[in-house]
A protein has these predicted regions:
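Small-residue-enriched flexible connectors and coil-helix boundary/helix-cap motifs
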Residues: 1-164
Length: 164
């Protein structure tokens, strides 16, 4: 059976609006730029679009300097980068505790104002390791802040059914 890849989408910020691509670079943790940033609550637990639908209104686009440009309704554009001191904090995504880089206070204020709750951004750099569930992976397999696996695919028929 042959399959056709009809579209490629990444979510540079977990749960944000998708970014369509013509092509993508596949890395060990998934597609380049996919879910390398995430919003977390005051305790470090990840926030999703299921809990906070406003996250899905954020448009995120990587720039050539390694920053992430964020746009959201009624908010100024934000250029998101790790804090200059490269401080780290523990983040929790689906029970995985990861040591991630934090953004600066201005970025934390931006996401807190947009969501209406205390929140902050964390970033998965090369030193941040999150292993794939060992029941479904090879030793050493790692993943971004995606729900569980480096690459996620869906059949068009299933997507059509979900959207009907």
């Amino acid at each position: 059976m042959a399959a056709t890849l009809a579209s490629i989408h990444v979510y540079p910020l977990k749960s944000c609006a998708p970014m369509a691509l013509d092509s993508a670079r596949v890395e060990a943790r998934g597609l380049e730029h996919d879910r390398r940033w995430m919003a977390v609550d005051a305790s470090g637990k990840f926030l999703t679009g299921r809990q906070h639908p406003r996250l899905t209104l954020i448009r995120a686009e990587p720039d050539d300097a390694g920053a992430l440009r964020l746009r959201a309704p009624d908010m100024p554009e934000l250029r998101l980068m790790p804090a200059p001191d490269r401080a780290r904090s523990t983040a929790d995504v689906w029970g995985s505790r990861v040591d991630a880089l934090v953004a600066d206070a201005a970025a934390d204020a931006w996401i807190s104002a947009f969501l209406g709750i205390p929140a902050r951004f964390v970033h998965m750099d090369a030193d941040c390791l999150r292993n794939v569930d060992p029941d479904y992976a090879q030793p050493g397999d790692s993943v971004s802040f995606a729900d569980g696996y480096p690459l996620l695919a869906i059949a068009q028929a299933a997507l059509d059914l979900l959207n009907s």
